[in-house]
């Protein structure tokens, strides 16, 4: 599923193309796309119609549109395959179009989702740590690209856990936006195995992992994110190309760019982890999972 850079690419596109526009009408074309909005399709369409899109915001992987004059946000769940496309209305309807919003700017905002894990929902905005976020996102920590991300405080929280460092990196209540791809890339850059226990790592080593996560996600963002298939696209339907720059993730049996040792794939939390067995020494005894 998309991680921080991919979601930020979408957010920037929405900010560029639809912020300032008002919603003239909304067509709900598949019930699963609004299943998180419990009052139903008519309520969602009714509340959105006439609203002005005042902003496009994000925290970690969570994306939402700020609406005026209401005090609610449109939370967009991209799921595994969700796309937010800004299209001229005369373009043919996409095969997996789930929601279409007609804007007064003359454009369509289209939510396309092949696997139907994503969707739209309205949520009230609440203040958390000096920022307004949807109440459904209130428990999510700041991400490494947030201007108010506190590296030292996050290092302290991470070190206070008794868990594998990769597991903690994936915990969105500790630090948000990092998924499997960028966790593996950050750990490779910091030369730390994902099974290392956080309370056995020094503060500087944990800081190195988080700094590496910042760096790799900034680089991915500059390349439009990581696209492994046609489902990961920006608002214009274009794919990113950071997958060409990955050092560890998905590189099983290929030489480590640093030392030449074959990258190894291991099972972790019902997914795959990729690491260099030489640069990232595994602990003698892997913690029970």
From Swiss-Prot:
It comes from Rhodococcus opacus (strain B4). The lineage of its organism: Bacteria, Bacillati, Actinomycetota, Actinomycetes, Mycobacteriales. This is Formamidopyrimidine-DNA glycosylase. Gene3D superfamilies: 1.10.8.50, MutM-like, N-terminal (3.20.190.10). HAMAP family: Fapy_DNA_glycosyl. GO terms for molecular function: 8-oxo-7,8-dihydroguanine DNA N-glycosylase activity; class I DNA-(apurinic or apyrimidinic site) endonuclease activity; damaged DNA binding; zinc ion binding. Keywords: DNA damage, DNA repair, DNA-binding, Glycosidase, Hydrolase, Lyase, Metal-binding, Multifunctional enzyme, Zinc, Zinc-finger. Binds 1 zinc ion per subunit. Its cofactor is Zn(2+). The gene is mutM. It comes from the Bacteria. SMART domains: Fapy_DNA_glyco, H2TH. GO terms for biological process: base-excision repair. It catalyses: Hydrolysis of DNA containing ring-opened 7-methylguanine residues, releasing 2,6-diamino-4-hydroxy-5-(N-methyl)formamidopyrimidine; 2'-deoxyribonucleotide-(2'-deoxyribose 5'-phosphate)-2'-deoxyribonucleotide-DNA = a 3'-end 2'-deoxyribonucleotide-(2,3-dehydro-2,3-deoxyribose 5'-phosphate)-DNA + a 5'-end 5'-phospho-2'-deoxyribonucleoside-DNA + H(+). Belongs to the FPG family. SUPFAM superfamilies: Glucocorticoid receptor-like (DNA-binding domain) (SSF57716), N-terminal domain of MutM-like DNA repair proteins (SSF81624), S13-like H2TH domain (SSF46946). DNA binds at residues 96, 115, 161. A zinc finger (FPG-type) spans 247-281. Its EC number is 3.2.2.23, 4.2.99.18.
């Amino acid at each position: 599923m998309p991680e921080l850079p991919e979601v930020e690419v979408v957010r920037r596109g929405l900010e560029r193309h639809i912020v300032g526009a008002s919603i003239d009408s909304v067509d709900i074309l598949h019930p699963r796309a609004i299943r998180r909005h419990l009052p139903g399709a008519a309520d969602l369409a009714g509340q959105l119609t006439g609203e002005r899109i005042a902003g496009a915001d994000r925290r970690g992987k969570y994306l939402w549109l700020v609406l005026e004059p209401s005090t609610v946000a449109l939370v967009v769940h991209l799921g595994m395959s969700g796309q937010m496309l800004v299209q001229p209305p005369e373009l043919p309807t996409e095969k997996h179009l789930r929601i279409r919003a007609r804007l007064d700017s003359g454009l369509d905002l289209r939510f396309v989702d092949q696997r139907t894990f994503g969707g739209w929902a309205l949520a009230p905005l609440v203040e958390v740590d000096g920022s307004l976020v949807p109440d459904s996102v209130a428990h999510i920590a700041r991400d490494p690209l947030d201007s108010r991300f506190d590296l030292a405080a996050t290092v302290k929280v991470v070190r206070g856990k008794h868990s594998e460092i990769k597991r903690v990196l994936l915990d969105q209540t500790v630090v948000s936006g990092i998924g499997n791809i960028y966790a593996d890339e950050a750990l490779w850059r910091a030369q730390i195995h994902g099974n290392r226990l956080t309370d056995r790592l020094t503060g500087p080593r944990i800081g190195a992992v988080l700094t590496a996560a910042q760096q790799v996600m900034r680089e991915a963002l500059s390349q439009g994110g990581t696209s492994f298939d046609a489902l990961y696209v920006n608002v214009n339907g274009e794919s990113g190309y950071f997958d060409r720059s990955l050092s560890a993730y998905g590189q099983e049996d290929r030489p480590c760019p640093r030392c030449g040792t074959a990258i190894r794939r291991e099972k972790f939390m019902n997914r795959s982890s990729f690491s260099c067995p030489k640069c990232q020494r595994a602990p003698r005894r892997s913690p029970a999972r």
